[in-house]
Amino acid sequence: MAGKARVHELAKELGVTSKEVLARLSDQGEFVKSASSTVEAPVARRLRESFGGGDKPAPAASNGAAAEAAAPPKKAGPKPGAPKPAPKKVAEPVVEAPVAPEPPAAPAAPAAPAPKPSPAARPAAAEAAAPAPAPAPAPRPGATPGPKPGAPRVPRVGNNPFSSAQPAERPAPRPQAPRPGAPRPGGASPSNMPPRPSPGSMGPRPPRPGGGPRPGGGPRPGGAGRPGGGGGGNYRGGGTGTGAPAGGPPGAGGGFRGRPGGGGGGGRPGQRGGAAGAFGRPGGAPKRGRKSKRAKRAEYENMQAPVVGGVRLPHGNGEVIRLARGASLSDFAEKIDANPASLVQALFNLGEMVTATQSVGDETLELLGGEMNYVVQVVSPEDEDRELLESFDLTYGEDEGGEEDLRTRPPVVTVMGHVDHGKTRLLDTIRKANVREGEAGGITQHIGAYQVAVEHDGTERPITFIDTPGHEAFTAMRARGAKATDIAILVVAADDGVMPQTVEAINHAQAADVPIVVAVNKIDKEGADPAKIRAQLTEYNLVAEDFGGDTMFVDISARQGTNIEQLLEAVLLTADAALDLRANPDMEAQGVAIEAHLDRGRGPVATVLIQRGTLRVGDSIVAGDAYGRVRRMVDEHGEDVEEALPSRPVQVIGFTSVPGAGDNLLVVDEDRIARQIADRRSARKRNALAARSRKRISLDDLDAALKETSQLNLILKGDNAGTVEALEEALLGIAIDDEVQLRVIDRGVGGVTETNVNLASASDAIIIGFNVRAEGKATELANREGVDIRYYSVIYQAIDEIESALKGMLKPVYEEVELGRAEIRAMFRSSKVGNIAGCLVTSGIIRRNAKARLLRDNIVVAETVTISSLRREKDDVVEVRDGYECGLTLTYNDIKEGDVIEAYELREKERV
């Protein structure tokens, strides 16, 4: 059969059922699905042979070689009168040869002189090769007798449809190393191999037709042990066998390409050789090249890579990865050359839900890095800012030049203390001005810087004073004041003692390693006890010189001006004795923004304290994420200043935006550099803010996060950056309950604009204006959109009102209050209303439509029952008091005499 055949056609041809054919194919190791499936030609041929139908294709042979091969051998073999199945078996490949995809010029006769002929085929092979001179002796016919006529047919081992020669039988394979790779589909296996002829029926192997031993020595790669191995070579280009006659047919020998004596299947260059399997690759197992060291190393590293959350990730081997605070998974993946999606999936499997571009907290980055054996270092903002400046060849915090370039500068003194202890009054007395009257509520809500010339030992010496707020909401301002100062004056009221903000100011000063001079104020008031103040401050390591310590105490009265000169003298003595107050004025200026605000006419205005160098008009400056050029400088008296030396506070005009309070100020060469530094700081600030404000949601608390929560959105506007910052921190510090959240969606310096109103309208927010008012048509727009704008001038009023608003947003909590009890004395039945209970009120009040529960033998029978109707003397009443009888109906009918009805109500409880 030249092509594919279906199973049911083969069954019809062989005269058996399709099930028998399928069973036989299964025994032979062929997987065939159904009777309508097709099988290849070699499989069909083996199937016919197994059913005894292998002689059907024999009449197709019409050449002389087949007839000559059909002749029995002369000396040995089957009897003359016996049927000759074996010669037909030899002639069968001749019929199949033209069907193979080889050139038709290849004759069928060379099938006989195969390099390893079976014993039954050797006489026929010798006769077929007779016309050519053969120096090698012919094989001995008697050594290998053919199969007996009655012997069972042995199906061929190979099933290669492209082979040009098919032996009738194969001897036992020679011992050789097994070939790599799995056996071919049509090859012999222990499960489908037919029984071999007995060893006694086979003589010793005759010599090869080519004569001497095959070059190369060892077993032929295409030998009998290879399934499907015949005379066919492995690849194209095979030549004539070594021992083949000169004029013999080409391709007489088999072997690999390039091997001496290797013959091709067809003997023609460029022709495809025989395949090892029925439908397999040419030549059997594929040729495998050796892997490079790089490929092996990559494969090994991939196998050794850690698996985090079911995802295979790179192995860090303890490598240190530096990430900025608020970095995203994309930034982390870029550092370790990984796929961001893999990091997202790994975190998700670990219970953390983030996106690739979302800012991630420090703990999450360190956790993920530890799983991959990376050491993640989250760079602090200070280190990151230093690295940013180093990238522009800039430094901050160091004086340029040597010791000879340093000049003495005035001391910077910060006045600190509890609220209403007299700090601003003291500064007013020193400056001979009145600053306190300008503050709302009599408390300082801004930070101010002034320079005052003080006469000391006949010499006028300047001192820079920084006034910080004492209210508890201005912790950050006090911290900034302590960092920018040289000496701290701690003001303590003699009649009030040490207060919480006093302790906080001490901690700020000690943390900044700043010497403290204590000013005991209000000694002129009744009840003043300076000795008590000295005793209290010893608990905080502030021991007076009178007690053997090194802290200077001065008793003053800011209102009366008592001992002010002694206080200034103590400040100067401390500065001269304990501090090295020198700076280089001949360098580009560096300083700190003490305060900043937005002025309607002048734009962003920053109060800057110069720490080193000289700031001049026209310099390119950058402070935090704000940059610009100095257009104007004004001192504390409102006069223009052309240059500011170290320790000089000035107001700088020329920023493009309002800098943050406490930002470092730096002079650069070009506006371009200032803009680049500001842009990078702004991006870093946004990432850090996003990482801080993002609430981590894990898979465990996902259900709780999805529950409905109340949220109060706020927009903060103030007159300066420090006040807005303090107000935001104070509001975010209000702790009410998890059910209510406070969110500041926008903040800024300046008046309330229409943009703020539109944002508040879109997000249902409340606008808080601190010392500012609405601009232009913002008020009309707010009234039209229904936006609530609250104005405050004292910070604690804003905090109290926002806290009250948050409490009002809490879900109400109800508590149960018992109203009274009634005992059922009689039962009445009505077809309209059901059971009617005749009751006696034993305590309290029974009220109509009140909640009730039914008790029977002090056991609750029914809960959440409602008193649907209530009557007294045939009149409908609202309530019945203690000692009276009544009739009532419940929404529960299973009542009995002796039951007790307990009425109660739920009252809303105030949340605190």
Swiss-Prot record:
<feature type="compositionally biased region" description="Pro residues">
    <location>
        <begin position="132"/>
        <end position="152"/>
    </location>
</feature>
<feature type="region of interest" description="G3">
    <location>
        <begin position="467"/>
        <end position="470"/>
    </location>
</feature>
<dbReference type="InterPro" id="IPR044145">
    <property type="entry name" value="IF2_II"/>
</dbReference>
<keyword id="KW-0648">Protein biosynthesis</keyword>
<dbReference type="Pfam" id="PF11987">
    <property type="entry name" value="IF-2"/>
</dbReference>
<feature type="binding site">
    <location>
        <begin position="467"/>
        <end position="471"/>
    </location>
    <ligand>
        <name>GTP</name>
    </ligand>
</feature>
<feature type="binding site">
    <location>
        <begin position="521"/>
        <end position="524"/>
    </location>
    <ligand>
        <name>GTP</name>
    </ligand>
</feature>
<feature type="compositionally biased region" description="Pro residues">
    <location>
        <begin position="100"/>
        <end position="120"/>
    </location>
</feature>
<protein>
    <recommendedName>
        <fullName>Translation initiation factor IF-2</fullName>
    </recommendedName>
</protein>
<dbReference type="InterPro" id="IPR000178">
    <property type="entry name" value="TF_IF2_bacterial-like"/>
</dbReference>
<dbReference type="GO" id="GO:0003924">
    <property type="term" value="F:GTPase activity"/>
</dbReference>
<dbReference type="InterPro" id="IPR009000">
    <property type="entry name" value="Transl_B-barrel_sf"/>
</dbReference>
<feature type="compositionally biased region" description="Low complexity">
    <location>
        <begin position="121"/>
        <end position="131"/>
    </location>
</feature>
<dbReference type="GO" id="GO:0005525">
    <property type="term" value="F:GTP binding"/>
</dbReference>
<feature type="region of interest" description="G2">
    <location>
        <begin position="442"/>
        <end position="446"/>
    </location>
</feature>
<dbReference type="Pfam" id="PF22042">
    <property type="entry name" value="EF-G_D2"/>
</dbReference>
<feature type="region of interest" description="G4">
    <location>
        <begin position="521"/>
        <end position="524"/>
    </location>
</feature>
<keyword id="KW-0963">Cytoplasm</keyword>
<feature type="domain" description="tr-type G">
    <location>
        <begin position="408"/>
        <end position="579"/>
    </location>
</feature>
<feature type="compositionally biased region" description="Gly residues">
    <location>
        <begin position="219"/>
        <end position="283"/>
    </location>
</feature>
<dbReference type="Pfam" id="PF04760">
    <property type="entry name" value="IF2_N"/>
</dbReference>
<dbReference type="InterPro" id="IPR023115">
    <property type="entry name" value="TIF_IF2_dom3"/>
</dbReference>
<feature type="binding site">
    <location>
        <begin position="417"/>
        <end position="424"/>
    </location>
    <ligand>
        <name>GTP</name>
    </ligand>
</feature>
<dbReference type="GO" id="GO:0003743">
    <property type="term" value="F:translation initiation factor activity"/>
</dbReference>
<dbReference type="InterPro" id="IPR005225">
    <property type="entry name" value="Small_GTP-bd"/>
</dbReference>
<keyword id="KW-0396">Initiation factor</keyword>
<keyword id="KW-0342">GTP-binding</keyword>
<dbReference type="Pfam" id="PF00009">
    <property type="entry name" value="GTP_EFTU"/>
</dbReference>
<feature type="compositionally biased region" description="Low complexity">
    <location>
        <begin position="56"/>
        <end position="74"/>
    </location>
</feature>
<dbReference type="InterPro" id="IPR000795">
    <property type="entry name" value="T_Tr_GTP-bd_dom"/>
</dbReference>
<feature type="region of interest" description="G5">
    <location>
        <begin position="557"/>
        <end position="559"/>
    </location>
</feature>
<feature type="compositionally biased region" description="Basic residues">
    <location>
        <begin position="287"/>
        <end position="296"/>
    </location>
</feature>
<feature type="compositionally biased region" description="Pro residues">
    <location>
        <begin position="173"/>
        <end position="183"/>
    </location>
</feature>
<dbReference type="GO" id="GO:0005829">
    <property type="term" value="C:cytosol"/>
</dbReference>
<dbReference type="InterPro" id="IPR015760">
    <property type="entry name" value="TIF_IF2"/>
</dbReference>
<feature type="region of interest" description="G1">
    <location>
        <begin position="417"/>
        <end position="424"/>
    </location>
</feature>
<keyword id="KW-0547">Nucleotide-binding</keyword>
<feature type="compositionally biased region" description="Pro residues">
    <location>
        <begin position="192"/>
        <end position="218"/>
    </location>
</feature>
<comment type="function">
    <text>One of the essential components for the initiation of protein synthesis. Protects formylmethionyl-tRNA from spontaneous hydrolysis and promotes its binding to the 30S ribosomal subunits. Also involved in the hydrolysis of GTP during the formation of the 70S ribosomal complex.</text>
</comment>
<dbReference type="InterPro" id="IPR036925">
    <property type="entry name" value="TIF_IF2_dom3_sf"/>
</dbReference>
<feature type="region of interest" description="Disordered">
    <location>
        <begin position="26"/>
        <end position="297"/>
    </location>
</feature>
<dbReference type="InterPro" id="IPR006847">
    <property type="entry name" value="IF2_N"/>
</dbReference>
